[in-house]
Structure formats: C-alpha cells, structure tokens
Amino acid sequence: PNDASAREALGLATDIGGYAIMVGGTNGAHLTSFSLVDIASHGRGVALMNPYYTVFFAPAIQDQLRVVGRIYKKYGYMEEDLDALSGRELGEAVAKAMMALGRKLNFPTTLAELPGFTQAHIDRALVAAKNPQLDMKLKNMPVPLDASSVDEYMGPILQAAATGDLSLIKNMK
C-alpha cells in the first residue's frame, strides 16, 4: 500500500487489461493459457502470451494498439512514433513494450523462461485449439482462425513465444 511505484504499475496493468477486454472476440493468449496451467497460472500464461498474439492480431486491432501504445510510451516502455506505424510494425512495437514492462517486473517474457516448459506444451495447445468445441473461440478472435489454420498460424506464434523471436509469427494476408 505504501509503494507508489507498485501502485502505479498495478493501475497501468489494470488499464491495459481493460483495453484488452474491450477488443471484441476472444484472445488467443487466453485460449493458449489453458495448455500451460501445469507451469503457469492462467493470468501469468495470458500475460506472457499477449505480446505474441498482439503481433498476429495487429492488422485487425490498430486503433486499440495505438491507445495501449500511448500508455506504454508515456511510461517510457517505447520510443516509436505510434502515428508513423501501422499493421505488424505497430504490433511489434507494442509487443516489445509489453515485454519491456514484463522484464522490469522480473516477469517471464518467453515460454522457455517458465520452469518445466517443454515442446509438449506447444503440442498440447495446438491440439486443444483444434477441438471442435473451441471452434467459435477461434472464429471470434480479432483475426479469425479455424482448425485447419491452427498449425499454420498459431504454431509460429507459440514457437515465437518459446524463443522471444517475433519474426517467426506469420500474419494472414
């Protein structure tokens, strides 16, 4: 209660979470987090995955990324001119700011940093995403997917999250 910096960070996280909720549809990070429950809490899994799905969703959520990006910029987590960026470049800038905040908080920014993480977690997430009962969750994402596109698009997102290499993420054309 007496740590003003921590209180400010919590407020910032709350704002960012609120903006994430305002994005229509389902977030892939939320869907993926259920396959990580043996190594990360639900919230931790979502927070870790958000930067990677941000890059994938970027062309469809540019207005929201500019709003969130201004918050990151205000607090020194990004230097880029948000108005000069669009699409994937905007998504990468915001994703890097998300990861910078995570690193400042000593929060893992890659799956490989989670004790117990293995390729089996990625495999489990890909299998789970193809479950017919989750079809509407895939279709409701800002960039809709279906079971036939999970490996092609979600697979690289998860590989990027394992390594921190945003260049692995493929955007739909």
Locations of the language-model features?
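C-terminal charged capping/lid subdomain of soluble metabolic enzymes
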Residues: 76-173
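Active-site segments that bind and position negatively charged phosphate/pyrophosphate groups
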Residues: 1-97
